[in-house]
A protein has these predicted regions:
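Right-handed parallel beta-helix
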Residues: 53-61, 65, 74-76, 101-179, ...
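Short acidic/polar N-terminal linker immediately downstream of export determinants
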Residues: 2-84, 92-99, 125-142, 243-260
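Short strand-connecting beta-turns/loops that link adjacent beta-strands
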Residues: 80-83, 109, 201-202, 222-223
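Long amphipathic alpha-helical scaffold regions
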Residues: 94-99, 179-182, 189-191
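Short, surface-exposed interaction patches in beta-rich subdomains
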Residues: 118, 185-188, 193-278
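Sensor of tandemly repeated, compositionally biased sequence architecture
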Residues: 34-36, 71, 154, 172, ...
Length: 278
């Protein structure tokens, strides 16, 4: 019962946060639109609906930080070789005014890339609840695989390819899929299922917390880790061949992956956990 109450509270907070991130911004957003770089954006209006496209490329230094937040729609990240990042965004709304009030801002330096939603006032959350003034975004990024990636406040599915740098995902209303984490990986506050593939693990390990959905941990044969699950409301199944279970109860599990090592922790899962090999 305590877990169910916790999950409900997480969902309520997540909805509030996503609303503010997607629509609000309030007094903290005092930034100019910086997406008119290398060609700018394209705007079109057809049959009463408006659409804006961003198609940009940027060069990033090794280990650059990439932050994606406040997106009302799906986010897809493809990992690529080299140091060039590509940003592809399609935004749609019922009117040009709604489109302008809910733009996507792209900010870039040699060591950072930010892709974020922007609202012109602090009333966006209530406007969203009333079903008005909404713009939808489809964000597709091609990023150097060694960047440090963080996404937060996403109202839609988040899909991330095989990254070598750290990956942090939080505040998602939708499914999360991470195709391959080699650095530190953390997933928090997701209203949807999570699939996390771990092919290697650094000393910081991996964390999955506050998930309202089934979690699938896909472990590579070379992974050595200590696995701890707590507060799981659902079935726990272990199918990976390199996992030795030391303790398993209805809502918890303690196991060793390979020869043991960095910690893989999962807490507050409302939907069960599957542990499989890749």
């Amino acid at each position: 019962m305590k877990l169910k109450i916790f999950i409900v509270l997480v969902a309520v907070v997540l909805a509030w946060f996503a609303g503010r991130s997607i629509k609000g911004g309030g007094e903290n957003i005092v930034a100019s639109v910086q997406q008119q770089v290398q060609g700018g954006d394209d705007v079109a209006t057809s049959h009463g609906a408006s659409e804006r496209r961003i198609n940009e490329s940027y060069e990033l230094a090794d280990g650059a930080h990439v932050d994606v937040h406040g997106i009302n729609g799906p986010v897809s990240v493809e990992a690529v070789d080299g140091n060039m990042a590509e940003v592809r965004v399609t935004s749609t709304a019922g009117s040009m005014n709604d489109l302008n009030e809910n733009q996507i801002i792209v900010e870039h330096t040699d060591s950072s890339l930010v892709v974020r939603g922007k609202g012109n006032n602090g009333w966006g959350f209530w406007k969203w609840l009333r079903g008005g003034g909404e713009a939808r975004h489809n964000v597709v990024l091609r990023l150097p695989r060694n960047v440090e990636l963080a996404t937060r406040g996403t109202n839609g599915k988040v899909t991330i390819g095989e990254m070598e740098g750290s990956v942090q995902v939080s505040g998602v209303n939708g499914r999360v899929e991470i195709g391959g984490a080699r650095g530190f990986a953390e997933v928090n506050g997701v209203n949807g299922g999570v699939m996390l593939t771990i092919t290697e693990l650094d000393k910081e390990g991996a964390k999955v917390n506050g998930i309202n959905g089934v979690v699938e941990l896909r472990l590579g044969s070379d992974v050595n880790a200590d696995l701890n699950l707590n507060g799981v409301n659902g079935q726990i199944t272990v199918e990976a061949p390199n996992v030795e279970v030391h303790e398993q109860k209805r809502s918890k599990l303690r196991a060793r992956v390979g020869t043991g090592g960095a910690a893989i922790k999962a807490n507050g899962i409302n939907g069960g956990v599957r542990i499989v090999g890749v």
